[in-house]
Amino acid sequence: MADAPTYIRQSTTGTATTAPTTMPVHPDTTYYKTTTTTVSDAPRAIADVNDDNHDNYDETTGLRSGEKKTRPLVTSTTAPIDAGRMTLGQKISRWTRIGSDLAREALAEFLGSFILIVFGNGVVAQVVLSRGAHGNFLSINIGYGLAVAFGVYIAGGISGGHLNPAVSLAFAALGKLPWRKLPVYMFAQYAGCICASAIVHAIYYDALNNYDGGNRTRGDTWQSTAGIHASYPQEFLYWQTGLADQIFATSFLMIGILALTDNRNTGPPGGVVPILVGCLVMAIGLAYGFNCGYPINPARDMGPRLFTLMAGWGSRTFSNYNPYIFNDYYQRIPYWFWIPVVGPHLGALLGAAIYFFFIGNHWPTLHRNVLELQVGHRDNSDDIELLAAKSRRPIEVVTTTETTRERRT
């Protein structure tokens, strides 16, 4: 038998609220009529439904209104929510919400990269400006590992939490990120790092003046203070070794990221991945941080370096010239700035290729029965087909912006 109809007010955002039975028509609101039908063994129940909807028979579709789940009563192209009844929080949310997925992802990458530098370089500033009294190289490694983890936690649900142009490039090469999004991701990452460097500089401005007397170009201190923001090589390092350092260190980073996010592998639950990526960065720093400070991220190095160029350190931040270090230092690496940019991009591509050819391309046809996938931005169609074939049961796929989940039905 048919229950009394209720009216549902539907907004363009997908939220719905139940309206009174007597429908108050608002010109900027779309209402839908729904009828709840209870089916029993009594023939009268079905007859009631047919009789109740006899007058609403649609000859075009051949269906009665009672056979439809919803029927629009009032339509409008204007705002679906009555602005007069919105709370302040709802109004702010409505005014500030961005409709473009790419713009939201760019904001997420900006904020994640900002968090990475504001914590990571903040630790470096504390160690350098206190002359080691408030930390050491281990503190820097731990601080950067935690900074990476928090940055990925913040941005991961929206953009994947790359925070690194080299990682974004590798994901694009693997087909996990559309190429059209790559320039936007990179721009957001560089912008976030530059802004974060400005915050670190402002917070430690007085301590910096106390350290170098306000002279950013002083020969015996400029590189140590500029090194708060960007990487600089040891005086014994040749450019060939520095480039190899960045290529291989970043390839290790990319191999680890792909292993952690590959659901066919023995990866962790999705919520643990940012912590393990932070541990991976910390391990790279502990193993390969001596030569040049393991930038392994073009935005992390070039963004703050651009800030130091504008904030008083001058062109030395790019030329690497320092007369206070023995004479052949400048001849060994006359221009260091390009190595932490080119090296990580090459290294990320190398790491992606290594993982693909050694691991990713060799999974058995029917891998273990994975009931839930949480991988961010990648196509899971192959996994879904394999799981359905193995279980011999249909698979219902629920797709959202951030994750793709599959379960048995």
From Swiss-Prot:
<keyword id="KW-1003">Cell membrane</keyword>
<keyword id="KW-1133">Transmembrane helix</keyword>
<comment type="similarity">
    <text>Belongs to the MIP/aquaporin (TC 1.A.8) family.</text>
</comment>
<comment type="function">
    <text>Aquaglyceroporin that may modulate the water content and osmolytes during anhydrobiosis.</text>
</comment>
<feature type="transmembrane region" description="Helical">
    <location>
        <begin position="110"/>
        <end position="130"/>
    </location>
</feature>
<feature type="region of interest" description="Disordered">
    <location>
        <begin position="1"/>
        <end position="24"/>
    </location>
</feature>
<feature type="transmembrane region" description="Helical">
    <location>
        <begin position="138"/>
        <end position="158"/>
    </location>
</feature>
<keyword id="KW-0325">Glycoprotein</keyword>
<feature type="transmembrane region" description="Helical">
    <location>
        <begin position="270"/>
        <end position="290"/>
    </location>
</feature>
<feature type="transmembrane region" description="Helical">
    <location>
        <begin position="339"/>
        <end position="359"/>
    </location>
</feature>
<dbReference type="InterPro" id="IPR023271">
    <property type="entry name" value="Aquaporin-like"/>
</dbReference>
<dbReference type="InterPro" id="IPR022357">
    <property type="entry name" value="MIP_CS"/>
</dbReference>
<dbReference type="Pfam" id="PF00230">
    <property type="entry name" value="MIP"/>
</dbReference>
<keyword id="KW-0677">Repeat</keyword>
<keyword id="KW-0346">Stress response</keyword>
<protein>
    <recommendedName>
        <fullName>Aquaporin-10</fullName>
    </recommendedName>
</protein>
<dbReference type="GO" id="GO:0015250">
    <property type="term" value="F:water channel activity"/>
</dbReference>
<feature type="compositionally biased region" description="Low complexity">
    <location>
        <begin position="12"/>
        <end position="22"/>
    </location>
</feature>
<feature type="region of interest" description="Disordered">
    <location>
        <begin position="47"/>
        <end position="74"/>
    </location>
</feature>
<dbReference type="InterPro" id="IPR000425">
    <property type="entry name" value="MIP"/>
</dbReference>
<feature type="short sequence motif" description="NPA 1">
    <location>
        <begin position="164"/>
        <end position="166"/>
    </location>
</feature>
<dbReference type="InterPro" id="IPR050363">
    <property type="entry name" value="MIP/Aquaporin"/>
</dbReference>
<feature type="short sequence motif" description="NPA 2">
    <location>
        <begin position="297"/>
        <end position="299"/>
    </location>
</feature>
<feature type="transmembrane region" description="Helical">
    <location>
        <begin position="241"/>
        <end position="261"/>
    </location>
</feature>
<keyword id="KW-0813">Transport</keyword>
<dbReference type="GO" id="GO:0015254">
    <property type="term" value="F:glycerol channel activity"/>
</dbReference>
<dbReference type="GO" id="GO:0016323">
    <property type="term" value="C:basolateral plasma membrane"/>
</dbReference>
<keyword id="KW-0812">Transmembrane</keyword>
<feature type="transmembrane region" description="Helical">
    <location>
        <begin position="184"/>
        <end position="204"/>
    </location>
</feature>
<feature type="glycosylation site" description="N-linked (GlcNAc...) asparagine">
    <location>
        <position position="215"/>
    </location>
</feature>
<keyword id="KW-0472">Membrane</keyword>
